[in-house]
Amino acid sequence: MELKEKLLDSHLAFEEQSEVNETIQGFRTRALRVFEKKGFPTRKIEAWKYTSLASVVNKNYALFPRTDSGIELKHVKRYFLYDIDTYKIVFIDGIYSPFLSETTHDGLDVCLLSAALSKQKYKPIIDKYFNKAAVKDESLTALNTAFAKEGAYIYIPKNKVSENPIEIVHFSTGEQKAL
């Protein structure tokens, strides 16, 4: 089975194991339709004429890898932004790690998207900005959106300055041959 078909076939199982807000669900469904129609980009597309994805799409991937990584702070601390105080949102193999993250609501919001979606006060901001920067008809953007489980929500009000840098850190353990 080709990777595109494997992804499309597995999306229903992905949906069933993901608890997600209705707003996000709508974005994911529309994105899946775009990916289904366009598939992976090929060299026939001007922007991809010098890049072949054949070596990527012709592999067998674990689409839903196990995420029992056991990573501890001592394993990843050296990858954080120097040794200064920052707000951190950390993901391990695509899964949020509350133990490695340091978020805030001290006059600004640095938290998980799901946490922001659960609060009515954030709805106007999310409706105005969420998923606006993505090129919606680009197939790889659509694929990423279709399988999105979680994200970071950062809101800094006008005339407010974050006292600490904000880091969004993604670690891949390499334990699974994940896409």
Task: Spell out what each predicted region is.
Residues M1-L179:
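Glycine-rich and polybasic anion-binding loops at the starts of cofactor/ligand-binding domains
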